Amino acid sequence: MEDLILGDALIEMKNIADNSIDAVIADIPYGTTKCSWDIIIPLQPMWEQLHRVIKPNGAIVLFGIEPFTSVLRSSNMKDFKYDWYWEKERLTNIAQVKKRAGKTVETISVFYKKQPTYNPQMIKYEGKKRTNKVKNGKMGKLTDTQQKKVKEYKDTGFRYPTQVLRYQRDILKSNLHPTQKPLALLEFLVKTYTNENELVLDFTMGSGTTGVACKKLNRNFKGIELVQKYFDIAKTRIGETNEQI
C-alpha cells in the first residue's frame, strides 16, 4: 500500500492518525542551497507532529549536513540517540578544497523514545578473515572454556555495520532531484528500522526514493511532497516499481 500526498508537510501530517507510523525516514531541507524548496521546516511544529504519529517504539531517521545537523540534534536532544555517516564517493565542495577540508559526508540522525526495531544489515568484510587458531604465548594458556569457544567460532565474512556507510550515487537517477540519495542506502535504512508490511512515512519525499525502497522490500509507504514536479516524478517511479514487483 502507498499513499502519496501533494502538499505542505506540517499541514498534511495533521491528517495522519496518532501512533500509526512504524518508522519515519526523510531527507528534510537543510537550508544550505539556493533552491526555492530548500527552506528549513520549523522544527518544533515538525517534532510535535512526528511525536504524535510515530508509534512508541518507532524510529525517526532524518538526513542532514552540518551546520544544520547540529541544529536538528539540539532541537530534540531528549530523543536523539546516534548518527550514521553516509560517505560519498566524491567531493561536494571541490571549489573550496584549497581553503577547507573536502566534504564527503552527510549525517543520518536517529531519534526514538523506546528501543525501535533494529535489524542489523551485515556488511561484507573485505579484509583478512579471523582464524580459529590461537597461539599460546606469553599471556598464558587458554582455559578449556575459551578453547571450546575458539573451536566453535567460524568467520562468515560479514560484520555488523558501523556508523560509516559507503554508497555510490545512482548515476542514472541522480538528475531526478538535486539532493537525490542512493536507493541502496534507503533500502539499508528501511530494512534496518522496519519489518515487512509495516508503514514508513517520508514527509519530504522528493523524487520518491524512500517509497521505491519500501515497495521493493514489501513495506507500506506514505509520502508527502510540496513541489508538484517532484511529486509527479515520485508517483511515476513508485508506480513503475509496483509494476515490476
Where are these regions (language model features)?
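Core catalytic lobe of class I
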Residues: 1-223, 229-231
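Conserved SAM-binding loop
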Residues: 234-235
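Generic C-terminal helix-cap and adjacent flexible tail
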Residues: 239-245
